[in-house]
């Protein structure tokens, strides 16, 4: 893309935009085309080969479909090694031998992922898990066993995943460890033997850390985390006699600790932060030593545990602005791929060489973003009406005063997830169109301790929704938001919150955009995939037992309150969504239309829980852009149905 062509395109987009005031037009930067912000990245997710000589990364083919490419470090010999022509590839890893790449792919968004092996010698591709209706997950590899991988498959029983050991040269798969019926994840020791797992108690929702001393030895329960605690397994220590776990027992936040593999006794606290839970742990792939861990309250921070790496993280922190993430490392740990995320620019990827502490840029995720002005994201802490501190992020349009702006409350999914600081294509798209964007880590968001998490138990449509209302009022009271022009928007749980916001606080919002959001909690849980079975008790504890308590379900499900909606609604849905069945969206739309309420509905026949294909993504967001401009008054790039999209207007 040339600079001249890009500027001409921006000028055309700005000239054709919906009418805005002369003052606003003069102050705001030109419209950034939707396909720059919301289309496929130019290049992303570089992963270094085990020997440190090559990187594999994702980039579009000449047909615009994301595929895996390989490049020799220091050369320009980039070669596409996969040949997907439809949904694109998003998950891949190197085999430890360096001879193969492994990638995951489903069909039409059904999330029954198959694991494929690409032979980098002859280019052949083999489906390693060629079983109809079976999902591959929990892939494990180990440098000491370069010709193998372990993978979980629900082949024997659709509700649970047994672990299979696959020979990557022949494709032969053998059952390694059978699931007794309650295990949700597995892990190996330094000898690549499955010796630990986490299981769910279906009676009380507790989580169990289970271990065994060898492959032929019986399993035994080591640690039990009650449902009100947070706990997770990170991995074995190198000697196999202790394990690293994250646990909130004895504290509010989850600490990273080491426990005895024989007794479960806590041996030492490795790292903790009083503000937030421990995050990603960084292990040496060859020695299995724990070397660093992240914490993220408002921004990502690294706590270095291996003194020999302190100078490396110091060098990375000084080399480039933004928050740094370590994406991959070679076997000897000498070369890394890293990513720098800033709030107002593209993601920068680089290779870091510990020898000389040299950082060599690779590419950015979208070069066109280097030529435009993006908006800044500010971390703010908002206090709810009952005193909870909610880490939130406010982004206001570049070139405009942050006063009386139309605002989009962008609600994250999960709800057991969180928003983070850094580049966000959806946020930048909205800000470029003239909207302030508010992202709130409401109660039940993860990473802020067990009290904050469990304050959201049974509070869908209750205090969780109040948190969002309080955040909007915060923005209004500070003069940032125009109270007449507030929208609520989100996907998955964020879609539910959109429906709940319009139904339960109809006076607050001018419009809403719901993407794959559930409208009836009972029917949502009735239609979940069979492999969610081990999570069912946890879902009841956190959401409420909507199967037994029909009055509670009617209270919190927007479907039963469709008559209260007053603001226009746009709904986007994937026809094959395995998590939120299409009936959730169709039911809400029909309930609103039966009452003569304004709703637009678009279904994409080859999508699941979200819009993976760029044609569908650009089609939906083009419709959403016009919808928001109509009801909030922001700018919009002209829209016509996108060629190749499978939109079905209903």
Predicted regions and their residues:
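Beta-strand-rich domains and repeat architectures in extracellular enzymes and scaffolds
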Residues: 35-66, 335-337
């Amino acid at each position: 893309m040339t600079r001249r062509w890009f500027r001409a395109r921006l000028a055309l987009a700005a000239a054709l935009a919906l009418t805005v005031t002369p003052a606003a037009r003069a102050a705001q930067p030109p419209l950034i085309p939707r396909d720059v912000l919301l289309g496929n990245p130019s290049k992303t997710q570089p992963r270094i080969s085990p020997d440190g000589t090559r990187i594999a990364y994702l980039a579009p083919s000449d047909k615009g479909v994301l595929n895996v490419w390989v490049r020799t470090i220091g050369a320009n010999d980039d070669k596409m090694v996969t040949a997907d022509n439809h949904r694109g590839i998003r998950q891949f890893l190197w085999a430890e031998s360096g001879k193969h790449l492994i990638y995951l792919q489903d069909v039409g968004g059904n999330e029954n992922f198959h694991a494929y092996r690409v032979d980098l010698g002859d280019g052949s591709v083999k489906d390693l898990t060629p079983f109809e209706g079976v999902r591959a997950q929990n892939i494990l590899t180990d440098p000491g066993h370069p010709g193998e991988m372990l993978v979980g498959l629900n082949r024997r029983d659709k509700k649970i995943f047994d672990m299979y050991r696959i020979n990557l040269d022949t494709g032969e798969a053998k059952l390694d460890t059978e699931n007794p019926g309650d295990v949700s994840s597995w892990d190996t020791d330094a000898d690549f033997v499955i010796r630990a797992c986490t299981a769910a108690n279906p009676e009380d929702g507790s989580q169990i850390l289970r271990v065994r001393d060898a492959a032929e030895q019986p399993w035994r329960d080591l640690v039990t985390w009650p449902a009100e605690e947070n706990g997770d397994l990170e991995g074995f220590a190198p000697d196999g006699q202790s394990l690293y776990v994250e646990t909130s027992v004895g504290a509010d936040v989850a600490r990273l600790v080491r426990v005895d593999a024989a007794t479960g006794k806590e041996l030492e606290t490795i790292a903790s932060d009083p503000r937030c839970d421990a995050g990603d742990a960084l292990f040496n792939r060859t020695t299995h030593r724990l070397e660093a861990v992240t914490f993220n309250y408002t921004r990502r921070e690294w706590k270095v545990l291996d003194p020999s790496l302190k100078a490396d993280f110091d060098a990375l922190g000084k080399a480039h602005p933004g928050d740094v993430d370590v994406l991959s490392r070679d076997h000897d740990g000498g070369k890394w791929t890293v990513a720098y995320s800033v709030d107002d620019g593209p993601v920068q990827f680089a290779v870091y060489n510990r020898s000389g502490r040299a950082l060599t840029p690779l590419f950015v995720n979208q070069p066109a973003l280097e030529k435009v002005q993006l908006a800044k994201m500010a971390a703010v802490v908002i206090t709810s009406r009952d005193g909870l501190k909610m880490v939130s992020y406010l982004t206001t349009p570049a070139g405009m005063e942050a006063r009386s702006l139309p605002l989009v409350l962008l609600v994250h999914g999960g709800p057991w997830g969180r928003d983070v600081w850094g580049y966000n294509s959806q946020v930048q798209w909205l800000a470029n169109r003239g909207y302030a964007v508010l992202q709130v880590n409401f109660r039940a968001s993860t990473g802020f301790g067990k009290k904050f998490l469990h304050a959201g138990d049974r509070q869908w449509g209750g205090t969780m929704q109040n948190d969002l209302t309080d955040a909007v009022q915060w923005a209004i009271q500070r003069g940032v938001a125009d109270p007449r022009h507030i929208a609520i928007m989100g996907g998955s749980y964020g879609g539910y919150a959109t429906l709940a916001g319009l139904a339960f606080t109809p006076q607050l919002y001018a419009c809403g955009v719901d993407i794959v959001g559930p409208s009836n909690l009972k029917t949502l849980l009735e239609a979940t995939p069979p492999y969610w079975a081990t999570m069912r008790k946890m879902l009841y504890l956190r959401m409420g037992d909507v199967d037994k308590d029909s009055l509670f379900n009617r209270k919190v499900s927007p479907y039963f309150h469709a008559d209260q909606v007053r603001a226009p609604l746009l709904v986007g849905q994937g026809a094959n969504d395995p998590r939120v069945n299409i009936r959730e969206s169709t039911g809400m739309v029909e309930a609103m239309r039966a009452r003569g309420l304004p709703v637009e509905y678009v279904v994409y026949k080859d999508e699941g829980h979200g819009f993976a294909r760029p044609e569908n993504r650009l089609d939906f967001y083009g419709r959403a852009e016009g919808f928001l401009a109509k009801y909030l008054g922001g700018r919009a790039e002209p829209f016509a149905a996108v060629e190749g999209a499978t939109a079905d207007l209903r």
